[in-house]
Every structure is written in C-alpha cells, then in structure tokens.
Amino acid sequence: MVAADSQPGTTALVSTPQVRAKSADVEEISRLAPQQQAERLLELAIDQPDLSLGLIHRNLTSWRGHLEDSDRLFHLVLQALNSNDPRVRVAAVEIDLAANNLMKAPESVDKLQRQIQNSSEERYMALWRLGALGNRGVEPTEAFRTLKRYAHDRNQEVRFWAVEGLAMLGNQESIGELLDLLACDPAAKIRQRAANGLSRSGLLTGEQRLTAVPELLNLLDDDALDAATQNLVYATLEAITGASFGKNASAWRDWWAHHDTREKHPTRRHPGLSLA
C-alpha cells in the first residue's frame, strides 16, 4: 500500500510494487482525495490503461461513498467510453456507478426503476445507468425488459435514452432490439443512435457486434427503409467489419459468405476484448 498523507479526505491508494516501480505518479495520486484519485486515474487510463486500470479496480471499494458525480468526473467517464479499449470503458462504468452510489445489487435496479418511472429529468440518466448496471451482471434480464419497453415510448427523448441504455447493456438481446429500432423507429435521431450502439458506442464487444452482420445484410433487401436508413445500414456494416464495399449489396453479401469463419466467429481472444 502506498503511503498517503494523514489528512481529512484522503485515502491510501492500494497499489503493487510493480506499479510503484513503473510510475512515480502513483505516490502523488495517493495523496489526493478520493474524488481526485478517481479522476486522475481515469484520465490516465485513457492513455495508459495498463498502468492505471488495476489501480482503479483495486480502489473502487474504498472510493465508494466518497465520490461525487461531478461535471469533471462525468466528462472523463464519457471520454473513456469513447476508448477503443473495452477495459477502459468498463472502468469508466465502474467509477460512474460508484459516484452515483449504485451498488451491484438488486436494490440499485429498484432505485433506478423508480427514477425511470418518474417524469423528471433524472429518468434519462437512470435508463443509461440501468443498462450499465445490467452489463455488470445485475439483473440484466430485468434491465433489458425495462429498456425495451421504454425504447417504444411515445416520448422521443425517453426512447433516445433507452437506446443508449441498450447499448450500455451490451448483450445479445440488446443487439436484436437495436436492429429493430434501426429499421423501424420513426425518428431519424433514434435510428442513428441505434446504428451507433451497434457499431461503436456502449459496451458490446467486437465479437458481439459481428453477430449483427447477417441481419444488417437482410436489411439491405428491405424496401421499406428510406435512403437515409439504408445509408446507416451500410455505414454500420463498415464500422463493424472494417470492410468497405460502399452501397454494393451484392459485394457485401459475397464478402460475408466467403469471409473466413474464424473472423465471423472468432475464438482467439484479442487483448482487452473482454468486458469482464
């Protein structure tokens, strides 16, 4: 354990000898208050994940009850959620849940459900955090059921945040719902967010995103889709696969049909791909 100043508002930062040897920043960070520790380590995680992610996870328990959902911290959370490293996205979620006093327990789901049922502004972020909590293993079935219901709400803003919650939930059920919303939601803004949830945002892994490809290819045959939505489908295919065949539906299908099976259903895990 790295020594911390014995002053109010500071907590010792749990570390390891290996991490201490690698970074002189750790001792300095250990002297900060928990809020600043969390902010600084999340900031470091965006650029130096191997150095800081372990420290974040080892200190989450001691931070709980000492963090505020400040503008700065939430800005860092959103920044980390844009990382290409899924481990960084998970660390951001864990810190956000701690800052909002959401334990990994059914009681937290109940708390969010009450906020969602309210018609106040807090319901929007509650939808987002319900998905995040479900991704961390807390009642994912109930989270999906709630998010699916609100994804079809008459209020477009509610649907928007339910879509964001589905992307954060990041399981196979949410993929199916996001595909349906991409094809069928009446609002272009919602279709765009559904496409983004499938291709880039949220907590789906690369392997999970690939499972959406067959249905995306099926959507290319859907004459009910307008041109803008068809373009979204092509863009989503490109973002997920890294391939580029423009708007040539036949080329996309041929490529997928002959694509290496190991790429369609990868068994070799890439570093940092797991969200565990």
Can you say where each PLM-predicted feature lies in the sequence?
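Amphipathic alpha-helical scaffolding segments comprising HEAT/armadillo-like alpha-solenoid repeats
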Residues: R31-E43, L67-N82, L102-I116, G137-H152, ...
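N-terminal "cap/leader" segments of large eukaryotic alpha-helical scaffolds
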Residues: D5-L51
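Terminal, low-structured helical/coil segments at or just beyond the last alpha-helical repeat
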Residues: G242, G246-A276
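Boundary/linker segments of alpha-helical solenoid repeat arrays
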Residues: K189, A224-A228, K264
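Repeat-solenoid scaffold signature
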Residues: E215, L220-V233
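Structural detector for internal amphipathic alpha-helices that build alpha-solenoid repeat scaffolds
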Residues: K22-R31, P49-E68, Q79, R87-L102, ...
